[in-house]
Amino acid sequence: MKKNNQSIDTLVLITNRQLLKDDISLATYGVALSRGIERIQKYGKHCINHTEESSLTYNIRRAYRSTVKANLHSTKLPDARADSAEPDNWMRNHSSLYTLCRDTDLPFEEYLQLCDAIGDTVVHHGKVITNREQLAIVLATAKRIHLPTNLIRYWQSEQEELWITLQQHFHDITMWSTVHNEDDIKLLASLGIPNLEYVLISPIFPTPCKTGHPGIGVKRGKELLKQIQTHYPQVQGIALGGIHEHNYQTCLQHSITGVAIMSDFMKRVHSHIDI
């Protein structure tokens, strides 16, 4: 009998188009992301993107028509059963799904277009914000904002005006951050963030993104989560770094709420690109 995959409470998909081998347009990338996310949202029941065209920006909408509608029959993926051996099958058994848009090298307007294409699951990354006008736009539109501890330190020292403005809106936003060590915990504890929802704890396992780092391991990750929860009892931990099908369950067995994946997710996104 086939063993069922353990349920993931919270699954975080992380975008990074630099992992794609092909040089594609932003519009095509947005459509591929939307497809990949929808597939995982539907617990393996694939369907063509049903996002209403009116909710998409002009560039994304134009690509939607050309790459989805015009090629409907050629682009439709095979139907997938819940018990099939699809590469992303393990990602589908989740309760909550978020997509952290990490393509912060994009110009600000293009970044916002990509977030629009991702849809309701999107978490905006604070690194894309460089001035008060941009901060105001993100504060007005984003449901969640991810501010890693290294970015917080940078804003405090080099972008003080941005940091002060953000603090004035602490009660209006839901924030995410990162925890790598005790220094990060001390920093977050000193801030008293009212709505700190998740912290990404990393790197749990070795990952090409941090060459030479052995990973902190799941036990260390659990210890860091317990420490941050003494200051933020409501905060949940997400394991990040080297997470894949064969090790994610180990994280869940150590009191970590969920897992974040980038490489495996971007492989699935690549499979949704029409070359």
Task: List PLM regions with ranges.
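Conserved N-terminal beta1-alpha1 strand-loop-helix module at the mouth
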Residues: 1-52, 59-67, 71, 83, ...
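Short, flexible/disordered intra-domain loops and linkers
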Residues: 20-26, 157, 210-215, 271
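Active-site-adjacent beta->alpha loops and helix N-cap segments on the catalytic face
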Residues: 105-117, 133-134, 148-166, 207-225
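Alpha-helix-loop-beta-strand connector modules within alpha/beta enzyme cores
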Residues: 117-124, 169, 177, 216-238
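Generic beta-sheet signal
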Residues: 131, 148, 178, 201-202, ...
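Glycine-rich phosphate-binding active-site loops on the catalytic face of alpha/beta enzymes
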Residues: 149-155, 200-212, 252-275
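Glycine-rich adenosine-cofactor-binding loop
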Residues: 235-247
